[in-house]
Curated annotation (Swiss-Prot):
Organism in which the protein naturally occurs: Nitratiruptor sp. (strain SB155-2)
Domain of life from the UniProt record: Bacteria
Ribosomal protein among keywords: no
Name this protein carries in UniProt: Nucleoside triphosphate pyrophosphatase
Cofactor: a divalent metal cation
Protein's GO biological process: nucleotide metabolic process
Enzyme Commission number(s): 3.6.1.9
Amino acid sequence: MIRLASTSETRAKLLQDTGIEFIQSPVDFDEEELLKVYKNPRDFVCAAARGKMEAAVEKYGLEIPIVAADTVVAVSDEILRKAKDEEEARKILQKQSGNKVDIITCMIYKDKEKTVEDLDVTSYIFAPFDEEDLQNYLKSGQWRGKAGACMVEGFCKKYIKEVLGRESTAMGLQVERLAEIAKDL
């Protein structure tokens, strides 16, 4: 049994599909302040995951091992955050259209004996997005709450030309690596 320090439905589904028993426990951590300090996406995502882990340990303790994670989307090392509105979502998606997009996830596992930090990157090469299709996606609102306004399992799927890496990383949790770490639980 592990404690997933996240409200993400996608991360919870990944754990369910992998057969890892868990309880989902949200934590309050504002990662926006970190953007002022960390410009490199890899440094930022690890700092955010560490912040979430610290908040989870403080709130819940380590009676149950904890997993915390953060994911960012980046194009040419520019961090693409969650869009605040439709216009920002359009700009973010236009940067991804026809480009290589890195989805970077830092996952941290912590129990009473050990802490394991795992950084993984999945890269997608996208074909240019169709303007009408993009407009329909924006109107649907499905981009809300998504890092980089990106849904590789939804809107972006048909534009994928090439994938380098694991789908689970792109979805926010390296469950294959977590299963190795937590196999004794």
